[in-house]
Design a protein with these regions (language model features):
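Sec-dependent N-terminal signal peptides
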Residues: 3-13
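Short amphipathic alpha-helices in soluble, non-transmembrane regions
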Residues: 37-41, 96-103
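Glycine-rich beta-strand-turn "strand-cap" elements at beta-sheet edges
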Residues: 52-78, 101, 105-131
């Protein structure tokens, strides 16, 4: 019985092997609206055709709430762009990003970026669902 339960746990974990990537960007204020336009009209169509983008959010001015026993805000400020993608596993995610370097379609999308140097700060975090 113990072996059966252990096997069930292993199978259950493997069935939930998908990962969620949460990406946060702090985009230069003067480039922000042009970046949002690019994201909506160029990045999202490209990304949605290739990966499962859960959602893509932008902050247009609502102040963040930073709390805790030692709250710190980055000297770069709070992110003003966040998006979440779901992948089967880390390998699928890494393959997507590695392919950007060789994909002519991505080259077209990136060439329309208003300012590739507008990313003050970028952060990618990886999570598994416990739901």
């Amino acid at each position: 019985m113990k072996k059966l339960m252990a096997l069930a746990l292993v199978v259950s974990f493997n069935l939930k092997s998908e990962i969620y990537e949460i990406r946060d960007y702090t985009i230069e204020e003067e480039d922000f609206e042009a970046y949002v336009y690019w994201a909506e009209n160029h990045f999202m169509p490209y990304g949605n055709a290739r990966i499962e983008i859960i959602d893509f959010w932008v902050n247009r001015g609502d102040e963040a709430i930073v709390e805790g026993t030692n709250p710190m805000v980055s000297p770069n400020g709070q992110p003003n762009v966040t998006w979440v993608a779901k992948y089967k596993n880390r390998e699928e995610r890494d393959a997507f990003f590695a392919n950007l370097d060789v994909d002519p379609e991505w080259e077209k999308v990136w060439s329309k970026h208003p300012n590739p140097d507008a990313y003050i700060h970028s952060n990618a975090r990886f999570f598994k669902s416990i739901k």
